[in-house]
Amino acid sequence: YYVHGESISSYLSLQPREFVSAICILILVIEAVRLRTGIVVVGQREYESRQISALAWGALAVALALLIAPDGGKEGMQAGIYGAPIILGMTLVDPVMGEIKRAKQDLRAAVIAGMVISYSVWLGCHLWIGTDIIAAVLLAPLTVLGEIPSTKLIDDNATMILLPLGGLVLLLPFL
């Protein structure tokens, strides 16, 4: 999105933000049809036949992060000053924490590993693309917090993005 969004979206004569919205709406429409028919797509869990899938939750959350997170007036990857660590955090922290929770049945170990990875992502983005250090320090734990609650109402793919995104929105006036 940050590097090639302009060229990809231009194939459909759209701006990058319009393209993100259109793809998200398309995924949500397909998800509504899937739910109505009770189809379980390969890779989905059986219970997802009756509720919004992890894929749909994740797509919605990523789209919101791309649409809401400010770009700091920058271009290219530097425009991902906040969106990139939010999305990368979920992408890298979720599978590690999930596997540790499943294999070791140890939430504490999962949280510690998640914090190490999340801080690595956020502080790495501080060094790489200039993410504010205050945002990195305060928002990294929110990624991990998004993995902890076990609920069928909203998938952790969404909460791991929406919690730091919400924190960012509240923190922005101070940055």
Regions found by a protein language model. Give the residues of each.
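Interhelical loop and helix-boundary elements at the membrane-water interface
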Residues: Y1-V20, V29-L175
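Selective transmembrane alpha-helices of multi-pass membrane proteins
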Residues: I23-C24
